Amino acid sequence: MASSSLVTSLLFSSSSSSNTATSTSSRRSFSLFSKNQYCKPRPLRRSSSRLLVRCSLQQQQEEKAAPAAESHHAGGGQDDAATASHHAVEGENGVADADGGGVKKSKEELEEEEQQEVDWRSDEEFKRFMGNPSIEAAIKLEKKRADRKLRELDREPDANPLAGLLRGLARGQLAREKERLELAENTFKALDLNKLKSCFGYDTFFAVDVRRFGDGGIFIGNLRKPVEEVRPKLEKKIAEAAGTDVTLWFMEEKNDDITKQVCMVQPKAEIDLQLEITKLSTPWGYLSAVALAVTTFGTIAIMSGFFLKPGATFDDYVSDVLPLFAGFLSILGVSEIATRLTAARYGVKLSPSFLVPSNWTGCLGVMNNYESLLPNKKALFDIPVARAASAYLTSVALAVSAFVSDGSLNGGKNALFVRPEFFYNNPLLSFVQAVIGPYADELGNVLPNAVEGVGVPVDPLAFAGLLGIVVTSLNLLPCGRLEGGRIAQALFGRGAAAVLSFATSVALGAGAIIGGSVLCLAWGLFATFVRGGEEIPAQDEITPLGSERYAWGLVLAVVCLLTLFPNGGGTYSSDFLGAPFFRGGI
């Protein structure tokens, strides 16, 4: 459907287009819902762009004509005579407007509009208009496009029956599209900012300035009471004044090192539409989640076979691998329950959980999308922390209990044997080898804790716990919409989180290029392109998090660094990036 494509394009291009417009006035824009900002918005079709130009030119002409009309009325008879003669000329040389409303346009004006359509890419008025697109304008422009196409079809002669049949089908499709656009036009309307100004006051949010943003606006001022008290009261007043439900965001913007508080107002119908477009809680979404879960269990099964002793039978495979599966399921299950309970406490809807398969570690964690607005920065912080902390605790509990039960000597009767190839060129896994011990010393001699020609024995549950710690740390990297990226956005803001995300992507890329790590390459590509971008802004980004959450963030950052940083006792036999002495050959 043509209308849905343009409306969707404007929804996801509003943030990037508004950045261009507001940067000229030295104001920082707010990219509301561009979840993956590394993806460019889809461009408008040329026919829609032409209509945008016409609408822009008509609006500019009306604005210029308004003061001229007032001066004509004040001028007296001479101005009236000039106006009359002007209309007389229009009556002789004019043609009916495309809308058929009786408004006349001269040939010069039509030629000018046609030239603007040809040169729309370089037209400054068009660029200013596109600086703040809205759904209401898109619907009107698509409706005009449908009307023009219908008139063109009516004027074309029926050269043959086949052409007439095709035109009839096209005419019917355009007529149905026009009806849908008329229904949508009654739903999506731009808010009247002049009416909304009176809703702000000393007892809620004192607004001193306002500017248009999409179909809503950004009110600049200062908050007079806590957000949890102001938001419901202000939403009710604005909804009554606007005649439609609205959604509010309380945020901060920096301009020349001056931080200002702003209240952003948007029609609720448009926000609900965008959340509906991007949600994954659909039959296809659940089917994809099941497919990824099956794939992940398959990669765990394949990866487990690499750690069996030589000559192992199928019974050995079952007895040795089942504990590893149980360990993975325990970590994933506990972290998923903790995440959904925390999200429910804040009233945040989550998408289905998507497992990330890996043929190296079996699983690289779980990813969720937010399918509703976040009420505040506390929710943005607590939800990912709940997943990370619960995964860490479960992994440590499994590893410690398994090491204690087998005496940390031979891995128990169902031991897995971790071969040295597992760690080769993988600095992110050095923590695992530092715990279970290396296979050989610096001279290549097999150490007592290893079995020559096989590997280092380890209990399956302990191995699952160690891998769970590493995978959780990978998800805590401050990149994109990983759990660590969400925490960084809550702690430091969107700008600092974007810088950290870029630095993390560069570091992972360096590990892949310099260190030759396949895991660095795979995780860097996944974090940058699949989970890249920024998370949805919280509705309350003014209320501070508090020192306790900053302390928790510091603790998680230290744990993440210690478990991922290359160490001499792990992957490498010497400090930092020394080459391993054992290269395989089992």
Curated annotation (Swiss-Prot):
Coiled-coil stretches are: 103-195
Report the EC number(s), separated by commas if there are several.
3.4.24.-
PANTHER family according to UniProt: ZINC METALLOPEPTIDASE EGY3, CHLOROPLASTIC-RELATED, ZINC METALLOPROTEASE EGY1
Q: Where in the cell is it found?
A: Plastid, Chloroplast membrane
Transit peptide start-stop = 1-54
Q: Which residues form the signal peptide?
A: none
Tell me where it mainly resides: plastid
The family classification in the record reads: Belongs to the peptidase M50B family.
Q: Which organism is it from?
A: Oryza sativa subsp. japonica (Rice)
Q: Name one GO molecular function term.
A: metallopeptidase activity
**Which keywords describe this protein according to UniProt?**
Chloroplast, Coiled coil, Hydrolase, Membrane, Metalloprotease, Plastid, Protease, Transit peptide, Transmembrane, Transmembrane helix
Q: How does it sit in the membrane?
A: Multi-pass membrane protein
What transmembrane ranges does the database entry give? 287-307, 318-338, 389-409, 427-447, 454-474, 506-526, 550-570
- Extract the ranges annotated as region (Disordered): 13-32, 58-122
Q: Which GO terms describe its biological process?
A: proteolysis
Q: Where is the composition biased (Basic and acidic residues)?
A: 61-73
Its recorded name reads: Probable zinc metalloprotease EGY3, chloroplastic
Relate the protein's function as given in its record.
Answer: Probable membrane-associated metalloprotease that may be involved in chloroplast development.
> What Gene Ontology cellular-component terms does the record carry?
chloroplast membrane
